Amino acid sequence: MLKVSALLCVCAAAWCSQTLAAAAAVAVAGGRSDGGNFLDEKQWLTTISQYDKEVGQWNKFRDEVEDDYFRTWNPGKPFDQALDPAKDPCLKTKCSRHKVCITQDAQTALCISHRRLTHSMKEVGGSHKQWRGLPSSTCKPCPIAYASPVCGSDGHSYSSQCKLEYQACVLGKQISIKCEGRCPCPSDKSMNIGRNVKRACSDLEFREVANRLRDWFKALHESGSQNKKTKALLRPERSRFDTSILPICKDSLGWMFNRLDTNYDLLLDQSELGSIYLDKNEQCTKAFFNSCDTYKDSLISNNEWCYCFQRQQDPPCHTELSNIQKRQGIKKLLGQYIPLCDEDGYYKPTQCHGSVGQCWCVDRYGNEVVGSRINGVADCAIDFEISGDFASGDFREWTDDEGEEDDIMNDKDDIEDDDEDEGDDDDDGDVHDGYI
């Protein structure tokens, strides 16, 4: 009896082993416990990164869904081979460095950022993750067509109007077309200038270029602040450009400089400046950046960057007076510091605050000369131009080591540094031809 029982146990064990082996073979052959959803497997999530390769560099200022967000395989392949449902379209798709390829269906490959992919997963128990679906499932995808780039109101370039509308749908915000072509939008005058016609640019045209670039940087800065949470910069603190020492660079200009300065040396070389797209028709844009390079060393320092834009602003003293009048309205506030302007709208060398009885010396752009503030009338016989006018060939070199903020600041509150926002989308920029 015991022998019969033992024999039955051995047979039962063998039958169970064969059954499990057969079930495993069926599963390997194509049977799936997840209902066919390949994204439910953790193994897939670790292997899709093999498609995350890109030849060359990626423009850091492009949106995640724009510029061929829906990628396709090589159109030179035979038609029947390209549409073979047995082949993974991601095998023939190259995504940017910070994106991965996923298969939307048998014929559509989709490049999506790591961040969006992570946000589309939710924890279900332990370490198992369940796919919730693409964030753009309700947004209409764009057909494959020739690129017709447009510049969006968020400061980003899109390969077509459809890509712009798709981006707006994915992000759930309003994005309109600012102009045809890539950002920044050219002026009306530059559209009528031939490609091969060389001419000198006027001061007015330089000012228009600076204003357009400043508006573009502001749109990028605000767009980045709205889309991402602020994160601390992973860079040496002493290598960062302290924008508080130069008020003109405390906002978007300083933010853009830190974005472009990828090696943190406080100098922009040709490869770093190449991240800014230049319209071939806008000859004055190239000339503008050439004018910023005071030392003619093919490098733009943080000082040169800030003062180059500062020179192209409206007369600073008149601008400050207008701002004061707008803030206080009809009533004049007691104790308010009122700057003294010359006939051209720039600051006079001697500035005084009658309420506190102090005077100090400034350059024509209103930057205070360190150590010149005294009680009483200051001796500012020299026309200071060192910090704003590089034409003099001399200027004061600011460094991050100098903690002279209390002496530099006027009778105003301290200016707080803007939060830097260089999160997950700090991709490598496309390298264009240098223009210096």
From Swiss-Prot:
It holds the Pfam family Kazal_2. InterPro entries: EF-hand-dom_pair (IPR011992), Kazal_dom (IPR002350), Kazal_dom_sf (IPR036058), SPARC/Testican_Ca-bd-dom (IPR019577), Thyroglobulin_1 (IPR000716), Thyroglobulin_1_sf (IPR036857). Residues 314-380 form the Thyroglobulin type-1 domain. Residues 133-185 form the Kazal-like domain. Residues 393-436 are annotated as: Disordered. Transmembrane segments: none annotated. Keywords: Calcium, Disulfide bond, Extracellular matrix, Glycoprotein, Heparan sulfate, Metalloenzyme inhibitor, Metalloprotease inhibitor, Protease inhibitor, Proteoglycan, Secreted, Signal. Its main location: secreted. GO terms for cellular component: extracellular region. Contains chondroitin sulfate and heparan sulfate O-linked oligosaccharides. Residues 1-22 form the signal peptide. It is found in: Secreted, Extracellular space, Extracellular matrix. Expressed in brain. One of its GO terms (molecular function) is glycosaminoglycan binding. Glycans are attached at residues 387, 392. Disulfide bonds join 90-101, 95-111, 139-169, 142-162, 151-183, 317-341, 352-359, 361-380. It comes from the Eukaryota. May participate in diverse steps of neurogenesis. Inhibits the processing of pro-matrix metalloproteinase 2 (MMP-2) by MT1-MMP and MT3-MMP. May interfere with tumor invasion. This is Testican-3. It comes from Mus musculus.
